[in-house]
From Swiss-Prot:
It is found in: Mitochondrion inner membrane. Belongs to the complex I subunit 4 family. It is a multi-pass membrane protein. The chain crosses the membrane at residues 1-21, 33-53, 77-97, 109-129, 130-150, 162-182, 206-226, 236-256, 270-290, 295-315, 326-346, 365-385, 405-425, 448-468. It is an enzyme of class 7 (translocase). It comes from Mycosarcoma maydis. Keywords: Electron transport, Membrane, Mitochondrion, Mitochondrion inner membrane, NAD, Respiratory chain, Translocase, Transmembrane, Transmembrane helix, Transport, Ubiquinone. Core subunit of the mitochondrial membrane respiratory chain NADH dehydrogenase (Complex I) that is believed to belong to the minimal assembly required for catalysis. Complex I functions in the transfer of electrons from NADH to the respiratory chain. The immediate electron acceptor for the enzyme is believed to be ubiquinone. This is NADH-ubiquinone oxidoreductase chain 4.
Length: 484
């Protein structure tokens, strides 16, 4: 079944390759083919979820195809990777729908990039080999670079694409060196073999630092955060959705799968340092969010703050913290794309400006938009009965067990998150109608149907977070106990 999840998007991309998009009918056929392919993959992932046994921490649905001297194609999922696979197949059709009407140039290649990107992301989460993990982890940059550089929103899009590409590629060179050293010492790149091997603490420290630099850039943590706001500001809407919904989650997965599982002693040693960086990043990003004038940059900085809370929970080295980090990652992967669709899609498509000061009084003329914007804004602020709140609470509870100071400082992020969320909604929704804006229509049917599944998932996982927590508990517990 995992093989099908990897192959189906590639088949869809190959079917798109010979098609010509010279007419409106042919463009519609290409979009329907890409959307249908991604929906088939989503249904298949739901079947995978239904057949998954959450009572064990072992890898399931494993398949092994060939073996060579240095790596082999071995795939499988556990409770940790399963939800990242589900998130990938859920977000991809939303990406395709989000730019359904406003990509006119090279549409075929735009759709092919997203289908190839879906395969690469799923591969990152299911491969059980550190070298293949690195290959797919870095291969994601190629379609992402094309998406931002070709279909971005302004003349500086190429610069933003290069910034994204070079920043993340530079950090990953250290990770490659670390993986080669692990292979040299252990004699294998298989996850299970590496996790059972014993590496002395001094070697672990060097390997840990090399991998951490790569993950810190992808998260991103201070001071490696510069690329993300620029990439979000220049990316097309679908690019922003996949950046917030999926690309940032690669770091979350890498922290759990590589650092905590394979280098546990070094993780314990460096945890206070990482939590300090996470708290500084959280406070800095939240304060920077209050100063933004571009609403895509504002949502981007809020994402940095939320990912800092994820890191704070992960490096508490507690079951509660890691459970909360995974739950918050999934919640952020749903809520943040919805905010980008609302401000970077609905508003920008109508008025073609991202400057917040031009917007005011939207409640009177776009009531449905205002309701949706209010719901996702308060979810982003982690109000009770939202999945963000459950995730942040568990992250802070885990941090409190290790060091109450980090938990108290991290809690300031909740206050600042509420501050910028309330300010943004009040600025856009209320007040007299702006003289800079023409009257326009409310949410279209496509926009509403695009937001509805995101709203459904955010509400269900907010009211019933145990749907996720119960099924990941065995895997996260196994992660902690095997590390200890």
């Amino acid at each position: 079944m995992l093989t099908l999840l990897l192959i189906i998007p590639l088949v869809g991309a190959l079917m798109l390759a010979p098609m010509q998009g010279n007419t409106r009918q042919s463009e519609s056929q290409m979009k329907r083919l890409a959307l249908g392919t991604s929906l088939i993959n989503f249904v298949l992932s739901i079947v995978l979820w239904g057949e998954f046994d959450s009572s064990t921490s072992e890898y399931q649905f494993t398949q092994e195809f060939n073996q060579v001297n240095f790596c082999h194609l071995h795939i499988g999922v556990d409770g940790i990777s399963l939800y990242f696979v589900l998130l990938t197949t859920f977000i991809t059709p939303i990406c395709i729908l989000s730019n359904w009407d406003n990509i006119k140039e090279q549409l075929k290649y735009f759709l092919m990039c997203f289908l190839v990107l879906e395969t690469l992301l799923i591969a990152v989460f299911v491969v059980l080999d550190i070298l293949l993990f690195y290959v797919f982890f870095e291969s994601v940059l190629i379609p992402l670079f094309l998406i931002v550089g070709i279909w971005g929103g302004s003349a500086t899009r190429v610069r933003a694409a290069f910034l994204l590409f070079l920043y993340t590629l530079f950090g990953s060179l250290f990770m490659l060196l670390a993986f080669l050293v692990i292979y040299y010492n252990v004699g294998s790149t298989d996850f299970q073999v590496v996790s059972l091997s014993e590496i002395n603490l001094e070697s672990q420290k060097l390997l840990w630092l090399a991998v951490f630099i790569s993950m810190a850039i992808k998260t991103p943590l201070l001071p490696f955060h510069v690329w993300l706001p620029r990439a979000h500001a220049e990316a097309p809407l679908a690019g922003s959705v996949i950046l917030a919904g999926l690309i940032l989650k690669l770091a979350t997965y890498g922290y759990m799968r590589i650092l905590i599982q394979f280098l546990p002693d070094a993780t314990s040693y460096f945890s206070p340092l990482v939590q300090t960086i996470a708290v500084i990043t959280l406070i800095y990003a939240s304060l920077a969010t209050l100063r933004q004038t571009d609403f895509k940059a504002l949502v981007a900085y809020s994402s940095i703050g939320h990912m800092a809370v994820v890191v704070l929970g992960l490096f508490s080295n507690t079951i509660q913290g890691i459970d909360g980090a995974l739950l918050l990652s999934i919640a952020h992967g749903v809520v943040s794309p919805a905010l980008f669709i609302l401000v970077g899609g609905v508003l920008y498509d109508r008025y073609h400006t991202r400057t917040i000061r031009y917007y005011r009084g939207m409640t009177a003329y776009m009531p449905l938009f205002s309701i949706m914007f209010f719901v996702f804004t308060i979810f982003n602020a982690a109000v009770p009965l939202s999945a963000n709140w459950a995730g942040e609470f568990l992250c802070l509870a885990g941090a409190f067990q290790r060091n109450p100071v980090f938990a108290v400082l991290g809690s300031t992020g909740i206050v600042l998150s509420a501050a910028y969320s309330i300010w943004l909604y009040n600025r856009i929704a209320f007040g007299a109608w702006s003289k800079y804006l023409n009257y326009t229509t409310d949410l279209t049917r496509r926009e509403f149907m695009l937001l509805l599944p995101l709203l459904f998932v955010a509400v269900v996982f907010g009211i019933f977070p145990n749907i996720i927590l119960d099924s990941i508990h065995a895997s996260t517990s196994g992660l902690i106990y095997s590390a200890s």
